[in-house]
């Protein structure tokens, strides 16, 4: 019998083993769709970003007007920009749901896959931050000023580090130029790390909602999950296009329609919605260094999750106490997101401090404690 080129060709067999003949658990739910959706988001962002970069000028005197020119005069420029801006929001929606799935179903026990995933999240956050600065509106400028200034809280080297990052004594032309360079480069780094992420995943195979070995009941990825992924894509595309075409500025800040002005500070400096939870944690601590450490810890804590797993069961499917705690954490993150968008005044300050404290308490103390308690309950 003639060899199948799909299985013998050096390049095609890699694609075959990753996307066609890959053995997958027969019972993975729609929560396993977000990985492929993230891949689609990345490809969309790289494509729209490339088209935008062709019309963008990374210069403080021209950046704002070059973006306006793209929207007004370039064929479908308005569409490309709206897809790119709102694509970032959907990228974060998908990654948050993907991480939530990992937490709920104990996927973090594949440590290498989990750690590369956390690195991907950090890289994505960096990419989104530098990208937000590029239109050079008021919130772009002041967001860049406030967030880069946080590095000055690092003892001894802080101020030097900030001036080195700025390329001067304030956020100015060199800052914009390097941020554009980074924003162009990082998505390709994300694509590279994604391949590493998948390589580690395919070493162990996918987890499943029961958290048990699925070796005895595997099905080929194609056609089952390839079609399921396409269904997931169409379901995501509907709200995405609705947002991008009907209310493209819903999630943006009106302040960014004003060109950057170092002499006028906006009344409320706040990042895009997907950073608000971390911003709320940063603001909840009155000390600058303490706030920066809490901000870093709010995301870096994900690296600790595999070590805080004390339950004898992998997933939360049959652990009602842990489930309650998980949804409490979700509610807590929504409260933090809301607080991050509010001004620093009573009662928002105390609510933010309580929510920040409970965020770390749930992850560091309550999850391991409840896991141990559930183990004990299994004996009775």
UniProtKB/Swiss-Prot annotation:
PROSITE patterns: CYTB_CTER (PS51003), CYTB_NTER (PS51002). The chain crosses the membrane at residues 34-54, 78-99, 114-134, 179-199, 227-247, 289-309, 321-341, 348-368. Pfam families: Cytochrom_B_C, Cytochrome_B. Its main location: mitochondrion. The keyword Iron applies. GO terms for cellular component: cytoplasm; membrane; mitochondrial inner membrane; mitochondrion; respiratory chain complex III. Binds 2 heme b groups non-covalently. SUPFAM superfamilies: a domain/subunit of cytochrome bc1 complex (Ubiquinol-cytochrome c reductase), Transmembrane di-heme cytochromes. Disulfide bonds: none annotated. Heme b b566 binds at residues 98, 197. A ubiquinone binds at residue 202. It is found in: Mitochondrion inner membrane. InterPro entries: Cyt_b/b6_C, Cyt_b/b6_C_sf, Cyt_b/b6_N, Cytb/b6-like_sf, Cytochrome_b, Cytochrome_b_C_euk/bac, Cytochrome_b_N_euk/bac, Di-haem_cyt_TM. CDD domains: cytochrome_b_C, Cytochrome_b_N. Its cofactor is heme b. The keyword Electron transport applies. One of its GO terms (biological process) is respiratory electron transport chain. Keywords: Electron transport, Heme, Iron, Membrane, Metal-binding, Mitochondrion, Mitochondrion inner membrane, Respiratory chain, Transmembrane, Transmembrane helix, Transport, Ubiquinone. GO terms for molecular function: heme binding; metal ion binding; ubiquinol-cytochrome-c reductase activity. It is a multi-pass membrane protein. Component of the ubiquinol-cytochrome c reductase complex (complex III or cytochrome b-c1 complex) that is part of the mitochondrial respiratory chain. The b-c1 complex mediates electron transfer from ubiquinol to cytochrome c. Contributes to the generation of a proton gradient across the mitochondrial membrane that is then used for ATP synthesis. Heme 1 (or BL or b562) is low-potential and absorbs at about 562 nm, and heme 2 (or BH or b566) is high-potential and absorbs at about 566 nm. Belongs to the cytochrome b family. This is Cytochrome b. It comes from Gallus gallus.
